[in-house]
């Protein structure tokens, strides 16, 4: 279990992460839709995740969403790196009704995000553009490469949830144990 605390003038965050968990979550960011996405992420990655965020949500949800991504990404990095005896690569296509989103990841120690999901507007009171902000913050602090790409879909909620679940399942698959892998790189280091 990794625990990280981060305080700024905009947010006060505590994250606990166990990547060898069972999908249990205790999420409280004060942003209902975001909590729902993080609960789905934890469940389908099989991570045990606790997130408590007190943020300036009276101003905007942006700081809370981005900062949770930063801290959760840092906790993931500390939990996983250096990568050893893991598959390293993972992918998933997740469908939710009319929506389908694909995610491919590499536990590369080279942060890069390709995000091609066409979600404009809001989901309830949640600005859909914040989904990309979360993924960018998570990916760059987790130091992974992730491609999250919409295959089809229109419903904002479905596209968002399929995106979080696709990342979760791809991470679970990349973290699958393979004792033959050793250091899964021809360079000998990630």
Swiss-Prot record:
It comes from the Bacteria. Keywords: Amino-acid biosynthesis, Cytoplasm, Histidine biosynthesis, Lyase. Its EC number is 4.2.1.19. It is found in: Cytoplasm. The keyword Cell membrane does not apply. Pathway: Amino-acid biosynthesis; L-histidine biosynthesis; L-histidine from 5-phospho-alpha-D-ribose 1-diphosphate: step 6/9. Belongs to the imidazoleglycerol-phosphate dehydratase family. This is Imidazoleglycerol-phosphate dehydratase. It comes from Nitratiruptor sp. (strain SB155-2). The gene is hisB.
């Amino acid at each position: 279990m990794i625990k990280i605390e981060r305080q700024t003038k905009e947010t006060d965050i505590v994250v606990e992460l166990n990547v060898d968990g069972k999908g249990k979550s205790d999420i409280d960011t004060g942003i209902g839709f975001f909590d729902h996405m993080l609960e789905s992420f934890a469940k389908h990655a099989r991570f045990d995740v606790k997130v408590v965020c007190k943020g300036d949500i009276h101003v905007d949800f942006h700081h809370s969403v981005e900062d949770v991504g930063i801290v959760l990404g840092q906790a993931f990095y500390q939990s996983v790196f250096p990568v050893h005896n893991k598959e390293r690569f993972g992918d998933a296509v997740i469908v939710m009704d009319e929506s389908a989103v694909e995610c491919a990841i590499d536990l590369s120690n080279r942060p890069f995000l390709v995000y091609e999901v066409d979600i404009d507007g809001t989901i309830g009171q949640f600005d859909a553009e914040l989904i990309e902000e979360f993924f960018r913050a998570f990916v760059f602090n987790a130091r992974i490469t992730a491609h999250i790409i919409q295959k089809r879909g229109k419903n904002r909620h479905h596209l968002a949830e399929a995106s979080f679940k696709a990342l979760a399942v791809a991470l679970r698959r990349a973290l699958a144990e393979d004792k033959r892998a050793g250091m899964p790189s021809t360079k000998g280091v990630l």
